[in-house]
Structures are given as C-alpha cells and as structure tokens.
Amino acid sequence: MTTQQDLLNKINSLVDQRATVPTNPYGGQCVAFIDNVLQYQGLFKLNFGYVNAIDCLDRAAQLDLKVTRFDGSNKPPVAAVWVTSCLPYHQYGHIGFAAAHNPDGTITTIEQNIDSNADALENGGWVRKVVRRLDGDGTFSYVNWQAPAQQLIGWFELPFENTKTEEKTTKLEELDMQKEFILKNGKYGFGVYIGGKYIGL
C-alpha cells in the first residue's frame, strides 16, 4: 500500500517535467498531473480522467475519498489534493498537491500548468514546485511565482498506509484491557504490562 512519503517522493520526482495522460488531449494540464500520479504511477488506481479541476472534489467524493471544504481557518494537510477557482480568468479551476507546511505559515505546493504560456489551455505546461500563502478569505496566492491568485475551494485526502495510526489503536486496546482488569478484580492503582499480561503493583 502507498505511504504518504511514497507520494511525496513521486510528485517531487516529476518537478520540471510535463505529466500527461492518454485520456487528456490538452497535454500538461493541471488535472492531467493529478490523474497521472493517482492512476498511472502505480501508487493508486484512482480515476481522475475526463474531468476539469473544478469538478475534482465531486469526483473524489464519488471515489469515497475524504473531502473537506475550506472554512476560513483550516488548510489542506500535507499530501492532500486541493482545488481552487480561477474566476474571472476561466471556469475550469486549478488543482495541485500540498507538499509541505512551512514555519512561516505558507504552503509548498506541487502543481502543473502555471507558466502562463500562450498555449496553456491547449497544450498545458510543466510541473512546478512553488510556495503559496493562504488567507482567511480563501485567497491562495503565490509567494515566489508570477501567476494570478486563486480562491481555495477545498481538498481531498488519499488512502495512505498509516503505521502510526495502527500503533495508536493497539495502545488504546491495551488501555481497555487494563480498565477491564481493574473492574473485574476490584483493584485500583498502578500496574505494568509485561509480555502482554497486566501485573498490578
């Protein structure tokens, strides 16, 4: 199963390249990058073909992925896929990955087709790693790149393997066992687990 680090390694490896898919005739579009990574790189089998970026939150919901809408204070977690509105410039929206949260509150993103080349809507662009600032009104602007700001709509999260969650679950189960022992034996106080058994002190 794919880990978060697997995804981050993959999207970083594609920076400055053009990511395309066989179902999109318009070259390196922003959504083609997402579809390339989520369907064709061996990480996931999530189909984001034949869809504009603006509709990807709906597609994600159809694929049973966790979808979150921007509420003025939250922000896309690392490795989430965010969606923005590009009005009034065009109605197709924009999409990319959140690659890192920075100490100054900015977000490093990896996204495609932000070079503003004249044929961007017909042939797309390249994958770029940039820094953005997210304001409370949803304005998602570039810090180190020349391109128009957009409005953040929301994001979706991917089904990663999570060993830390499994470890926490095990610890909670141990706590339940400990509580059960105390209730059955009428004992209170401290104890330890040794070899899977609870020993009262």
What are the residue ranges of the model-derived segments?
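Extracellular cell-wall/glycan-interacting regions and their flexible linkers
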Residues: 1-201
